[in-house]
Amino acid sequence: MEMAYWVMVMMMVWITAPLSEGGKLNDVIRALAPDDVTPQFILRSLISRRRSDSDVREVPVCSWKICPP
């Protein structure tokens, strides 16, 4: 338990130290994530994992409780 406390304290110091040197919070937060993790990268990886259109079944759209056969 004591080890977890010190790990937490050191992480807080590691995150807040650049702020005391004049850094901006946004820059500190961005430095915590790897450079290749961007919204564009995440979107591309999600699209590449998506099944092809032939695998996706079309669900009939029902309007006014009348569904196509």
From Swiss-Prot:
Primary subcellular site in the record, as a coarse category: secreted
Report TM segments: none
GO cellular component terms, A-Z = extracellular region
Q: What does this protein do?
A: Moderately activates human somatostatin receptors (SSTR) with a preferential activation of SSTR1 and SSTR4. In vivo, does not cause behavioral changes in mice within a few minutes of intracranial injection, but causes a progressive loss of movement thereafter. Four to five hours after injection, mice recover, even with the highest dose tested. Shows antinociception and antihyperalgesia activities in two mouse models of acute pain, most probably by acting outside the central nervous system.
Residues recorded as bearing 4-hydroxyproline in the entry: 68-69
User: According to the lineage, what is the superkingdom?
Assistant: Eukaryota
Residues recorded as bearing 4-carboxyglutamate in the entry: 58
Found, by tissue, as follows: Expressed by the venom duct.
Family classification? Belongs to the conotoxin C superfamily. Consomatin family.
According to UniProt, the name of this protein is Consomatin Be1
PTM sites of type D-tryptophan = 64
Q: What else is known?
A: This peptide is an evolutionarily optimized stable analog of somatostatin. In addition, it adopts nearly identical conformations as in the somatostatin drug analog Octreotide. As this drug, it contains a D-Trp at the same position, whose synthesis is a common strategy used for enhancing the metabolic stability of compounds in drug design.
Q: Which cysteines are joined by disulfide bonds?
A: 62-67
Q: What is known of its domains?
A: The cysteine framework is C-C.
Q: Where in the cell is it found?
A: Secreted
Instruction: Please provide, alphabetically and separated by semicolons, the GO molecular function terms listed in this UniProt record.
Output: toxin activity
Propiece span(s): 23-57
Q: Which residues form the signal peptide?
A: 1-22
- Alphabetical keyword list: D-amino acid, Disulfide bond, G-protein coupled receptor impairing toxin, Gamma-carboxyglutamic acid, Hydroxylation, Secreted, Signal, Toxin
